Regions:
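Sec-dependent signal peptide recognition
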Residues: 2-10
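C-terminal motif of bacterial Sec signal peptides marking the signal peptidase cleavage site
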Residues: 14-17
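Short, conserved catalytic or interaction motifs in soluble domains
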Residues: 20
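Segments that shape or occlude catalytic/ligand-binding pockets
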Residues: 23-223
Length: 223
């Protein structure tokens, strides 16, 4: 029995050592990088628009507890066919959240005609059973970003002295694949700190194990 116990302890120690070794092979950089967090309630539209959007969702019985509003527009839409009806069109673009974290590149767009729901673009998430804990450190994330920039971006050298920002959330690995099931993984979104939407380039996404999902410099996306 003692031999079995000792064998189990040795196996655990070996597994732990291997895990640490794998984690240590990731590039690290101790330069500037900050972690940011955008709660679902920190909308990027004015408070007046938030009230308007809340009313639209409420009046049309659309659940909005996991939606962060980042764009709102209103205009007159006229159909291209007789009788050429005109509608008061309101469009709301949102980020989706689950477990309090953003799902990257999983946005939705809602269109309302005369305050009534007209159509939705994008797939509604089914959520995830994954927790909100992460493994990667900020120096590792900065190291990964700089390594990706060096590999894919001709302007890589200018980012060596640039401060970065990192956001933890989830990513659907089947993004862009029609009719494919949603496969959410823990992920990080890395961009220059002073970049502002919609010009947050370059932007890189990594799984929480350090595997690159995509690197986009605004001209070309690399995976």
């Amino acid at each position: 029995m003692k031999n079995v116990f000792r064998t189990a302890i040795i196996c655990i120690m070996i597994f732990s050592a291997c895990s640490k070794r794998e984690n240590n092979v990731l590039p690290e950089d101790n330069g500037c990088i900050e972690r940011i967090y955008l709660p679902v309630t920190t909308h990027s539209v004015s408070s007046a628009y938030v009230t308007t959007i809340n009313d639209l969702f409420s009046n049309n019985q659309i659940a909005n507890g996991n939606l962060r509003y980042y764009k709102y527009s209103r205009d007159i839409f006229q159909t291209l066919y007789s009788p050429y009806t005109k509608y008061d069109q309101q469009i709301v673009e949102v980020n989706q959240y689950t477990n309090g974290l953003r799902i990257f590149v999983r946005d939705l767009s809602y269109s309302f005609w005369d305050q009534r729901f007209h159509l939705r673009s994008g797939e509604v998430t089914k959520g995830t059973s994954l927790d909100t804990l992460h493994q990667l450190t900020l120096p590792q994330l900065r190291g990964l970003f700089l390594a990706s920039a060096q590999q894919f971006d001709k302007a890589a050298d200018k980012f060596k002295d640039v401060c970065l920002k990192a956001e933890f959330g989830y990513y659907n690995l089947n993004t862009g694949i029609s009719y494919a099931p949603e496969v959410l993984v823990k992920a990080w979104r890395i961009t220059p700190l002073n970049s502002v939407y919609p010009s947050e380039y370059p932007v890189a996404y990594y799984q929480d194990n350090g595997k690159l999902i995509s690197y986009d410099n605004g001209i070309q996306t690399s995976r």
